[in-house]
A protein has these predicted regions:
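Positively charged, low-complexity intrinsically disordered leader regions
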Residues: 1-15
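Short acidic low-complexity segments
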Residues: 5-8, 116-127
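Conserved Lys-Pro-Asp/Glu-containing loop-to-beta segment of HAD-superfamily phosphomonoesterases
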Residues: 192-231
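Active-site phosphate-binding/coordination module
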Residues: 44-121
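Substrate-recognition element of Asp-dependent hydrolases with the DxDx(T/V) motif
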Residues: 17-18, 29, 38-65, 78, ...
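Conserved small/polar residues in nucleotide/adenosyl-binding loops
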Residues: 280-284
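Asp-based phosphoryl-transfer active-site loop
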Residues: 12-27
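Acidic, Mg2+-coordinating phosphoryl-transfer loop and its flanking beta/alpha structural elements
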Residues: 224-257
Length: 284
């Protein structure tokens, strides 16, 4: 449901769950007004975390890119789908269990951080299998995860984005590779860490709580993104208020005619809306 507020959103909410591409940056370039708006919100006491379906980029690498925009960012503030997926698996299997990992080094490291044993063969009899974005994947690696899943390993994935934009055009994304395993085994993943599932926002709330502090209540969190079918839908599924910005893929026409499950709580042309009184209408 669309809302309006008499206070700036950065004062009305304690925790901002910010998408990255199309909101904070486009590729290597910062989105206009984004960094200054984030700094202002943090100056008012808002905590900011950055959420991304990308499962291959290390948190430290993303943090360094954001520091290049003059943002004060620590790696823990970057919540990738690998971080979320590894935590999901760790809660589902015994400590020290064998987990087949098909993904980039970042995913392998996150699984190992959870006290799980990373394996590369179905012959190791893993109790779980996790698949993430891995453009260098071989046929044999894909076959191995299919064997593991077919043998009963619980199947997790980092995200189900079917496509990924590249300089030369649209390429198959993680979801397309996952479909190959589903088609081979007939088994659907039990969980996906990436948006539009709400797990990423739920884990971000937990990770923002330090030194035994209670997590910020959902009602005090604001999900911010440019994509209705990922960022905003994840907020709606999880019960989070959301802010849609028009600096990425969504245009005013799509916002006006979005079905209910894709409608944001607030709308702004860019992240300056984070520090302004927010209204529900768009000026076209």
């Amino acid at each position: 449901m669309l809302k309006s507020t008499t206070r700036p959103l950065s004062e009305a909410y304690q925790l901002a769950l910010l998408d990255l591409d199309g909101v904070v940056y486009r590729g290597k370039n910062p989105v206009e007004h984004a960094a200054e708006s984030i700094r202002k919100a943090e100056g008012l006491g808002m905590t900011v975390e950055y959420t991304t379906n990308n499962s291959s980029r290390l948190q430290s690498v993303v943090a360094d890119q954001l520091k290049g925009f003059d943002l004060d960012v620590e790696p823990w503030q970057v919540i990738t789908s690998s971080v979320v997926a590894a935590r999901m698996v760790a809660r589902a299997v015994p400590q020290g269990a064998k987990v087949f990992v098909l993904g980039a080094q970042h995913l392998r490291e996150e699984v190992a951080k959870q006290g799980l044993e990373v394996v590369d063969s179905a012959e190791d009899k893993p109790v779980a299998a996790i698949q993430g974005w891995y453009p260098d994947m071989s046929w044999n690696q894909m076959a191995q995860i299919a064997y593991a899943v077919e043998q009963g390993a619980t199947y997790f994935v980092t995200n189900r984005d079917l496509t990924i934009p590249r300089e030369l055009g649209i390429a198959p994304g993680c979801g397309s590779m996952i479909m190959a395993v589903i088609n081979a085994t007939g088994v659907e993943p039990v969980s996906s860490a990436g948006k539009p599932e709400s797990a990423m926002y739920d884990e971000a709330r937990l990770l923002a709580a330090h030194d035994g502090a209670e997590p910020v209540a959902k009602e005090a969190c604001l999900a911010i993104g440019d994509r209705l079918d990922t960022d905003i839908e994840a907020g709606n599924r999880g019960g989070y208020d959301s802010l849609a910005v028009l600096t990425g893929v969504t245009n005013p026409h799509e916002l006006m005619f979005a079905p209910e499950h894709l409608r944001p709580t607030y709308i702004a042309k860019d992240l300056t809306g984070l520090n302004a009184v927010s209204y529900t209408h768009l000026t076209l």
